[in-house]
Curated annotation (Swiss-Prot):
Tissue-specific expression: Expressed by the venom gland.
Entry's family note: Belongs to the rTX family.
Species: Macrothele raveni (Funnel-web spider)
Lineage of the organism: Eukaryota, Metazoa, Ecdysozoa, Arthropoda, Chelicerata
Source organism superkingdom: Eukaryota
Cysteine pairings via disulfide bonds: C42-C58, C47-C63, C57-C73, C65-C71
Listed name of the protein: RTX-VII
Free-text comment about domains: The presence of a 'disulfide through disulfide knot' structurally defines this protein as a knottin.
Amino acid sequence: MKTIVYLIVSILLLSSTVLVLAEGNAASHELQEYPIEEQRKCVDGSCDPYSSDAPPCCDNQICQCIFFVPCYCKYRGK
């Protein structure tokens, strides 16, 4: 009897795990359908390198932070 109960519980756990993984793959696939430029517009001015949600600097610019001055985008090599 314990074996049957164990088998049923194992099947239920396995099927729920498969469903969760399938939903996660579907969600990540939806994000990949749109290019990064459409998800987050770039900025030409102030930037925030410490936030993963902040948009990146445009083109060949980098985000530069100097002490207490707010961070800003500047062209590489200038």
